[in-house]
Curated annotation (Swiss-Prot):
Source organism of the structure: Saccharolobus islandicus (strain L.S.2.15 / Lassen #1) (Sulfolobus islandicus)
Protein's UniProt name: Translation initiation factor 6
GO biological process, one term: cytosolic ribosome assembly
Pfam families attached to this UniProt entry: eIF-6
Keyword Protein biosynthesis: yes
Entry's Gene Ontology molecular function annotations: ribosome binding; translation initiation factor activity
């Protein structure tokens, strides 16, 4: 499996800065060339340098899959136009919601999405249409409503909060149609997304992620 430890801007919380699917990886401007080369090599995608809401916290603000990308309503017009032009094979939409941390509130692969319980019916419909998923439901993971922050799911597997119950795991596996395991990142963090960036081709983990955590991640993501 293509897997590599990584730090960005002096932190191991790489998932707050990076968004990826199987076609594109969106990263902050200002990364050094070696870091960008490593990201491309591991994830096997085209690299797009961008901002959202004049911020580099792309992994927090963006959610999506190979079909579509959702941006928060705080996205500035020129940022939206730039991503719309460069994410050519994906539908790109702004979700007009008071919720802006879409990466933390939507967990998705190409088949399904689990979303923040407080999204309304209109927001749920837009999310489903933009992502082109067959299934969508509102819910929690290990009593956490910020479902995108405590899990990462690809089309090959998934890793979620270590306190997720067996019943929840089975429900998640049925929803996403992949095997899903529990684990941690960055030496014990339950906020999986903050330390794990993955697609079907490769995985980046925060630099403080331990050997046992990496073994669990590799198994969970289907490698």
């Amino acid at each position: 499996m293509n897997l590599q430890r990584l730090s960005i801007f002096g932190t191991d919380n790489i998932g707050v800065y990076i968004y990826t699917n199987n076609k594109y990886t969106v990263v902050p401007r200002g990364l050094d060339s070696e870091t960008k080369e490593n990201i491309v090599q591991i994830l096997g995608t085209e690299l797009i340098e961008a901002e959202i809401s004049r911020s580099f916290l792309l992994g927090i603000f963006i959610s999506g899959n190979d079909n579509g990308i959702l941006l928060p309503k705080s996205t500035i017009d020129d940022e939206f136009r730039f991503l719309k032009e460069n994410l050519r094979d994906c539908r790109v939409e702004v979700l007009n919601s008071k919720v802006t941390a879409l990466g933390n509130t939507i967990l998705t692969n190409n088949k399904a999405a689990l979303i923040y319980p407080e999204f309304n019916d209109i927001e749920e419909k837009i999310i489903k249409e933009t992502l082109g998923v067959e299934e969508i439901r509102r819910g929690k993971i290990a009593q956490m409503i910020t479902v995108g922050s405590v899990g990462v799911v690809t089309n090959k597997g998934g890793l979620v909060h270590v306190d997720t119950s067996e019943k929840e795991l089975k429900e998640l596996e049925k929803l996403f149609s992949v095997k899903i395991d529990i684990g941690t990142v960055n030496f014990g963090s339950v906020f999986i997304r903050s330390g794990l960036v993955a697609n079907d081709k490769g995985t980046l983990v925060g630099a403080s992620t331990t050997g046992p955590e990496i073994l669990r991640i590799q198994k969970a993501l289907g490698e």
